[in-house]
Regions:
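Conserved acetyl-CoA-binding loop-helix of GNAT-fold acetyltransferases
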Residues: 83-96
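Conserved active-site alpha-helix within GNAT-family acetyltransferase domains
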Residues: 109-136
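Active-site beta-strand termini and strand-to-loop segments that position acidic
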Residues: 52-54, 151-153
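Short loop/turn motifs at secondary-structure junctions and domain boundaries
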Residues: 39-43
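Conserved beta-strand in the GNAT
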Residues: 50, 56-64, 69-76
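N-terminal amphipathic/basic-hydrophobic helices that include classical n-h-c signal peptides
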Residues: 1-13, 156-159
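Conserved GNAT acetyl-CoA-binding A-motif
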Residues: 98-110
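A short beta-loop-alpha structural element at the N-terminal edge
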Residues: 16-28
């Protein structure tokens, strides 16, 4: 379900649309990631939620549907759209459509407050199973400072 809003930055009104992206070839998402951030290989098993300003794609959240949870595996917002609350609104829009299973993500220490405010909580590594357990365990052994977080299905969110 797309949700349209109007916001103002400086003197320019933004025409915002929050929606789940459903293009089967995922070329727009691939182009967005490769142009603005990093390499991306399209994966049809992911659910992708986007925010557009008019017709411009300005942010995307990628969630992979795993057996017992959704894995937040990508979250990007163009720099000049950051610190305006759009990332929080996009994440809330995505999570509000995922009511059947919790959402798990990894965050760097400086990102943790953002996710805590969005309804996520600490997740001890020993409570995770399967391939993500192996991935996160390996990252910690290699010295990566990551925070493992979970947002339970239907968690209340306070902005």
């Amino acid at each position: 379900v797309a949700r349209d809003e109007t916001s103002v930055i400086g003197k320019r009104a933004m025409e915002l649309t929050f929606e789940e992206y459903c293009d089967a070839d995922l070329s727009l998402i691939r182009d967005y990631y490769e142009t603005t951030f990093s390499h991306y290989v399209p994966d049809l098993a992911e659910r992708i939620f986007v925010v557009r300003d008019a017709h411009w794609l300005v942010g995307a959240v990628r969630l992979r549907d795993e057996q017992d949870y959704y894995h937040l595996c990508g979250f990007r917002l163009l720099p000049h759209y950051q610190s305006l609350g759009l990332g929080s609104r996009l994440l809330q829009h995505a999570c509000s459509d995922l009511l059947d299973k919790p959402v798990i993500c990894q965050a760097l220490p400086f990102e943790k407050p953002f996710y805590l405010k969005a309804g996520f909580a600490d997740l001890p590594l020993n409570e995770l199973e399967g391939p993500l357990f192996s991935l996160y365990d390996q990252q910690r052994e290699q010295g990566y400072q990551i925070e493992l977080l979970v947002r339970q299905a239907k968690a209340p969110v306070y902005n």
